[in-house]
C-alpha cells in the first residue's frame, strides 16, 4: 500500500548538547548540559537563556535526570543551560557562586565565538532546592559587589533552601548521616556555628539599597524535604525591602520537586514572568 500525505509541522527543533566543559579547577572539571533551538534553514532570532542549577543538598549533582523535564521548559522558547557546580564534599561555600559566574562567562564567550542563537541580554537564573539557594546567593553576591557576573534579568526559585538555619532544624534527608548545611560550610555542626550559617543564608544580604532582578518563587505547602518556611521567610524579607517578588505557594501538595514544577500551570507562570522582565 502506498499513500501520499501532507503534514504540517513546525521545523523548529530542540537539541541536547552534552558536557560543555566550562572550567578546569585542577582537581575537577565542571560541565554544562545544554538544550538549544535548531532549525535546518537557520534561526531568525536569539533566545533567552535560563541557567538551571539542580538541587542535591549541595552534594554531587545528578545532571541528567531533569533533562526530559527541562526540555518541556525549553520548548516554551528558551535555551536551557544546566550548571554542574562543585559539590560541598570537595569545596565549601561560597565557591559554588564562583562556579555559576564562570559558567555564565563561558556561555558568553561561546555566544560570540560560535554566533550561537542565545540572547546574551536575556539571562535568567533558576534553581531547585539547594540549587535555588545558590541561584539567589549568586545574584545577591553580585548586587553586594562580592562578585561581578553577567547581568541577570530574573531569578526563578523552586523549593528554595534559602535559610540554612531553618534547614538545620529539619530532619536529615533520607540516606544522609551528616547535615548537608554543615558540610556546605565546612563546620562540625550548625548549632555551634549559627552566625556563619546566617551569613550564608539569603536573608543576610537583602537590603533595600541593593539592586536585585525580579524574583519568582514556588514552594509546595507540605514539602517533605525543604520546609516551606524557607520561601515564606525569603518572600517576607524581599517584600519588606521593596524588591520585586512573586511567590506561588502550592497548597495541599506534598511534593519537593519533579513533575509538579514542570506542569503546564507552572510553566505558564514562568513564561509570563520572563516576558514581563525582558
Positions of the model-derived regions?
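Alpha/beta-hydrolase superfamily serine-hydrolase fold, recognizing
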Residues: 1-278
Amino acid at each position: 500500500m502506498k499513500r501520499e500525505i501532507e503534514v504540517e509541522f513546525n521545523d523548529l527543533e530542540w537539541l541536547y548538547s552534552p558536557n560543555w566543559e566550562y572550567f578546569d579547577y585542577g582537581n575537577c572539571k565542571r560541565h554544562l548540559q545544554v538544550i538549544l533551538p535548531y532549525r535546518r534553514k537557520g534561526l531568525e532570532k536569539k533566545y533567552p537563556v535560563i541557567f538551571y542549577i539542580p538541587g542535591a543538598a549541595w552534594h554531587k549533582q545528578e545532571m541528567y535526570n531533569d533533562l526530559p523535564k527541562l526540555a518541556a521548559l525549553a520548548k516554551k522558547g528558551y535555551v536551557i543551560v544546566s550548571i554542574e557546580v562543585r559539590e560541598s564534599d570537595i569545596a565549601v561555600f561560597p565557591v559554588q557562586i564562583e562556579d555559576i559566574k564562570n559558567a555564565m562567562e563561558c556561555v558568553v564567550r561561546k555566544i560570540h565565538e560560535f554566533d550561537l542563537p542565545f540572547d546574551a541580554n536575556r539571562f535568567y537564573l533558576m534553581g531547585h532546592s539547594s540549587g535555588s539557594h545558590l541561584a539567589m546567593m549568586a545574584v545577591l553576591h553580585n548586587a553586594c559587589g562580592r562578585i561581578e557576573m553577567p547581568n541577570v534579568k530574573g531569578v526563578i526559585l523552586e523549593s528554595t533552601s534559602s535559610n540554612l538555619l531553618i534547614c538545620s532544624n529539619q530532619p536529615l534527608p533520607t540516606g544522609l548521616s551528616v547535615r548537608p548545611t554543615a558540610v556546605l560550610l565546612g563546620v562540625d555542626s550548625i548549632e555551634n556555628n549559627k552566625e556563619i550559617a546566617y551569613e550564608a543564608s539569603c536573608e543576610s544580604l537583602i537590603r533595600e539599597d541593593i539592586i536585585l532582578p525580579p524574583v519568582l518563587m514556588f514552594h509546595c505547602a507540605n514539602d517533605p524535604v525543604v520546609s516551606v518556611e524557607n520561601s515564606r521567610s525569603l518572600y517576607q524579607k524581599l517584600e519588606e525591602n521593596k524588591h520585586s517578588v512573586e511567590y506561588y505557594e502550592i497548597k495541599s501538595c506534598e511534593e519537593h520537586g519533579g513533575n509538579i514544577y514542570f506542569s503546564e500551570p507552572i510553566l505558564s507562570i514562568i513564561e509570563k514572568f520572563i516576558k514581563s522582565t525582558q
